[in-house]
């Protein structure tokens, strides 16, 4: 019988994940070892004495494992195998132990045997690295010649070539002894011939043989003439240019081009390698654009080995951008003058290109042109430039019109339109943006300086219980979504299924069918042609349709009652958690039977809710349902884990701590759960977002407070300008934004900042940094708003607000504590700075904005400037990134920098990272202190992430898009995690992510080397060379690659 202590133990698998410890696995491994050594067939029973020995050794190993875990040690699979080995010797079973050791040594030896260590002896005697791409290229040429292919090679042929190449590489590895990893080029070509015939490509094999004979004759003739064989630098292809003409490109010309792109990184990048890789994909008549793409793809493919290739790829793409926009290479001697001329021409002809017609009249274009610094292009990595190219640069008839610096200046000009000294402020804004200190949200980047300057990120609306308003809000969603806004809808007021419709004397079908219409509208109206609309639907947990609402995202059931494209979120009052703690019942109502309940919060909500429950008991309310709070909670957690929805958001802290409690109620959040503003039938709440890049403010071992203060002051001014410049798709949005002037200043690169400071996310130091950085941002953001109020006046609904009553965000924690009680609120309230000067400023000048701070996900803008998203921990240290231009692997540059300093960044380390899915825990060469600093999201206990969020929450006046991570969630862990989030004072949470969401691409990991074949198989299996596909993604954020509505 397994005791409780053993059941609670977890070990670390080879994929880096913690899993429950299972003694049966040890027993089974030992049984297989004994059968193999003693040659006992599987169908034969084990002798009693051997079975007894196996059980005894299993017990001894289990005891040692449990003791080590109890002592706080991390136990890996490899460590358990060491224990098994030791126990076999202790028990006198040397023969089994010996075979066990030999097997393990074989597996280690396989790790060193890889095509990456192979060398090729060329005909001239020189030795070069083996490059499988050369085989692919030769095969492609043979297939193209046989099939008389024109243009691009068909994908079916490429797949066939990939399979052949893999088989050929495996055969080559078998031919090369471990001691001398060299092979003759002729031998390689022989293997190619054989493999072509093995799979039945006789025509291709014939052409390949004839080609080899022809090349041999050419070489013989050269030798007779006394000439030497051409070097690879003399290879050439015919290239088809855009105008239809052709020209010859030689290997050496391409090498010169790539050498310029690599010139900034002579020690870490290899232009010759890129040239070989690119040339291997060329064919006669290749298009110019395909040549460029092949070069970029070659650099991109090497990013996982050397992060500097990301900047090489960026440089190559920049050259494309400059040629497209300016008609000149970025290496042109007169580039700066050409850039200035193009900028002035672009703005002057702006009417043609959808620019704001006023730009050319209101700004000194010469001064702006001179202010742009092209050297700042060098800050971009490949992903940043690719994102800008694919999504953000203005274009006309398929041609990009902007370079990175023109893009930043266009955004800056748009944000300076209402300034007195427009040119001076545009330059100030440009300098902040182009140095990556602050980045506005995606709608602002899309539309600032454009004809339709819809710059706002988030809209929140509430739906009234009548058809006219229902369809008005749906129509408003369409208009808001058209201009790239992300939307949060509150649907709690809609009467439930079965409620009486007095006008027709019929019965309502409830809220679900209307959410279905909302879903289909979001899909139908895309955001400026860039992606489908994005909506989150909120419902309070006492609504009678709430249980059906929970199942909206399920893949089974009646499709008429499913909404697969909208996001859904629960709006949860504190009373529900109190009932949950008391193991009490929870009553579901139809909103038309409980007037005022949705608008109430805190003690007033509890009073009304209990009054309506009494009416149920007396029979005054007939349409209701009583459920156990625990059962409903279990269903909420189950759906959250199964579908990723509904997100958990908390009604009472969102309202009790709201600065605008005098002007209404917060009824829901936005698309990404960070915005908390009042909305009503006459007001659609609006928020404008932007994020500070924390990395740019790290100096030495801390934050540069003066620089951060300056950044915040300018950023708040830009966000304030958005409100006045903005194009408003609806009247309700315009009136709300002008009345309350909400802005959402957030952060990104939190994890990068921790790396720079050598701090682990799973540490008290990280908690303190989250606290201190948030306090500074809150301090200087409030100061900036006060100074703007002095300059421009307070927002119109300022009187009566918490600001006006002398309450800052830190002060409102006590209000929440007064309602909840100390047991249900565990928030730190300490501070480092003297807040009296800020209190005096607020009292003297008031506030320019009703709300100031919110932390958005920043999924796309963080990619542009090359930092980690928002406040997110590192997901993996090696992960596959997808964008409109395809997939590529991205490594953690901070980790690689550390590993390089230790001298342990090499091909084996990269292979280990891939094998262990981007985790470090089981890579023995990496020191423990680095493993602690570089824990990934699923290796960090949720308590650390929640505590960091709680420290931020005490300073910010709205919310934060907070993803939570569990490697292997179960009901108890999930429940504890969300209850902890509630008790720590969080206002909202976002996605729950599980470790099955994604794995690192293993296409280039030899799975036979890793022992994925049956445990005790002595010979290589037929399936050993197959490619491991990435696991199917579990439900996670569909907006992962670019929540363009909120960042």
Swiss-Prot record:
For this UniProt record, the keywords arranged alphabetically read as follows: Allosteric enzyme, ATP-binding, Deoxyribonucleotide synthesis, Disulfide bond, Nucleotide-binding, Oxidoreductase, Repeat
Q: Name one GO molecular function term.
A: ribonucleoside-diphosphate reductase activity, thioredoxin disulfide as acceptor
Highest taxon of the lineage:
Bacteria
Q: Where is this site: Important for electron transfer?
A: 990-991
Q: Which organism is it from?
A: Chlamydia trachomatis serovar D (strain ATCC VR-885 / DSM 19411 / UW-3/Cx)
**Documented activity regulation:** Under complex allosteric control mediated by deoxynucleoside triphosphates and ATP binding. The type of nucleotide bound at the specificity site determines substrate preference. It seems probable that ATP makes the enzyme reduce CDP and UDP, dGTP favors ADP reduction and dTTP favors GDP reduction.
Catalytic reaction equation(s): a 2'-deoxyribonucleoside 5'-diphosphate + [thioredoxin]-disulfide + H2O = a ribonucleoside 5'-diphosphate + [thioredoxin]-dithiol
Protein name, please?
Ribonucleoside-diphosphate reductase subunit alpha
Site (Important for hydrogen atom transfer): give the residues: 458, 687
**Per the record, where is site Interacts with thioredoxin/glutaredoxin?**
1043, 1046
What is annotated as the active site?
A: 670 (proton acceptor), 672 (cysteine radical intermediate), 674 (proton acceptor)
Describe its assembly: Tetramer of two alpha and two beta subunits.
What's a BP term from Gene Ontology annotated to this protein?
deoxyribonucleotide biosynthetic process
